[in-house]
C-alpha cells in the first residue's frame, strides 16, 4: 500500500485518495496520516459512488476485495468503468480475496497484497507485493514514478524464507477456502448467531472468481445478546488470537 501511495503521490501530490467501502483501519489511516489525506465513502450504489467521486475529485480510488472485516465487495467492474471515464487510477487490495481466488488485475490499475498473511502462511515475515496492470493507461507514468522511489527490499534471508514457506500456498488456499466455508455453514444453524458476513453471499465477489477460486479464509459474525455477551465469548474462545490471518496454525 505504501508504495502504491508513493506512486500516486508523485502523480497527484495535492489530492486525497478515496476509500470506497469501510476498510481495515491501516488501509485508511496510512494515506490519511502520511500522505495528502484520505476520504471514506460507504455507499454501495454505483450511481451514488460516481457522484461522490466527482465531488471529491480524488487522486486515486482504493478498494479492498473483499473488505476487512465486513467481507463486502463493491461492484468493481462498474467502478472500474467510472474510474476510466473520470481519469482516476483504481487501486485494489486483494489480500483477503487472494489472486488465487479472484481476478482483480483485469479491472484495476494497481493491485497490492500483503505477503505476510495468506501467501506466507507463517505470519512471521513482513512483505508485500505490487502488480501494475500492463494495460493501464497510467502504466508508463507508474513505471517512471517507481524508478524515482527508493523501494524497500527484503534481506536475502527473508527472501529465501518467504520462498520456502510459500511453496504450498496453492494447497493452503484451497484448504482454507474449504474450512472457512464449512465453518460458515455450521454457524448458520447456530441459535446464538445473529449475522454472518462472508464473501459467498456477495454477487460482486462471485463475479470475480477464478475457475478454481473460493471464498478465502476469513469470515465475521455477530452474536445475539450484544457487546457484553460478545466480550465473554471472545475471552472464553480457546484459539490463537492476533491481528493477522491466513496462517497454518
Locate the predicted segments by residue:
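Conserved C-terminal alpha-helix-loop-beta "cap" of PLP-dependent enzymes
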Residues: 195-249
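Conserved PLP-enzyme active-site core in the AAT-like
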Residues: 2-192, 197
